[in-house]
Amino acid sequence: MNLAYIPSPTFSKFEIGPFTIHMYAICILIGICVAVWILTTRWKRYGGTFDQILDTTLVTVPCALVGARLYHCITTPADYFPPTGNLVNILKVWEGGMAIFGGISVGTLVAFLWCRHKHYPFAIFADAIAPALPVAQAIGRLGNWFNQELYGWPTTLPWGLKLNDADAIGKSEICYSGAQCPDYRTTLFHPTFLYEMIWNLIGAALIIYLGHKLADRLKAGQQFAMYLMWYGLGRTWIENVRINYSTVILGLRTNVWTAIIVFVLGCILFVVLYQYGPDPKAQARGLAAVTADELERQSIEEEQLRQKKQAKRTK
């Protein structure tokens, strides 16, 4: 019997009147808010404004969440598609199942298109959000803790995770493989949600540190490439500790393949940007010019609106 362990929460949702509030959703929401705060702080240093980030967030985040959900459903089709699954389950996001790789892919594409539409330099937007993403992901992982999901193999380590939900053990790959399920009351499991939280927070700190230390040497976009490399590397080993059911291709879990691809893409992007990437200072000057133009138009529109209101009062 292990005397030291990490307990699981005794609840994953609560009621406020007729509404059911899921902790999984709260964790994701808090993560998004913290990420927006970090992103805004860094974006302003480049010469941007909060309104620019707010508009970008309102466009990008919903698309990223849809991408995260669809990626999860596509890579674990048994629960969502016939003959074994139900399409209605795709809509049950409160039960968990948001794959960050899908969110990153769709979110990056939408952010790129939006920045292009608004004439914002995407490379420094990517750098600004680089440490914000892993922080948001770290906070979001707490949702897996509340749902008692995505844990790892059995362990005797003093930081092992203790489950208190009989249904939680059925979510593991051990049961899917036909082996006897371990007794959740006496077995501890690797808290992979915690491993990823720590890994992500270290990554965010490293990106901020290196971005400051190497400010004169880095090209615009290289900090985002660091994020891709760090997260891809981390998910490669963390994914091999997890035992939730996952589609296996050529002996490796789907997310391991995706993590490897993300890591390689990050390496390639880092090298290419080092050779051909834009100068961050030039990009910042471009953003400052766009911001000044937006503020001028906004001032003109506000003045026109004020004059219209004044004209109505004098009639």
From Swiss-Prot:
Its main location: membrane. The keyword Phosphoprotein does not apply. A 1,2-diacyl-sn-glycero-3-phospho-(1'-sn-glycerol) binds at residue 141. It comes from the Bacteria. GO terms for cellular component: plasma membrane. It is an enzyme of class 2 (transferase). GO terms for biological process: lipoprotein biosynthetic process. One of its GO terms (molecular function) is phosphatidylglycerol-prolipoprotein diacylglyceryl transferase activity. PROSITE patterns: LGT. InterPro entries: Lgt. It is found in: Cell membrane. The keyword Transmembrane helix applies. Pfam families: LGT. Pathway: Protein modification; lipoprotein biosynthesis (diacylglyceryl transfer). Keywords: Cell membrane, Membrane, Transferase, Transmembrane, Transmembrane helix. It is a multi-pass membrane protein. Its EC number is 2.5.1.145. The chain crosses the membrane at residues 19-39, 93-113, 188-208, 256-276. Catalyzes the transfer of the diacylglyceryl group from phosphatidylglycerol to the sulfhydryl group of the N-terminal cysteine of a prolipoprotein, the first step in the formation of mature lipoproteins. NCBIfam families: lgt. PANTHER family: PHOSPHATIDYLGLYCEROL--PROLIPOPROTEIN DIACYLGLYCERYL TRANSFERASE, PROLIPOPROTEIN DIACYLGLYCERYL TRANSFERASE. Belongs to the Lgt family. This is Phosphatidylglycerol--prolipoprotein diacylglyceryl transferase. The lineage of its organism: Bacteria, Bacillati, Actinomycetota, Actinomycetes, Bifidobacteriales.
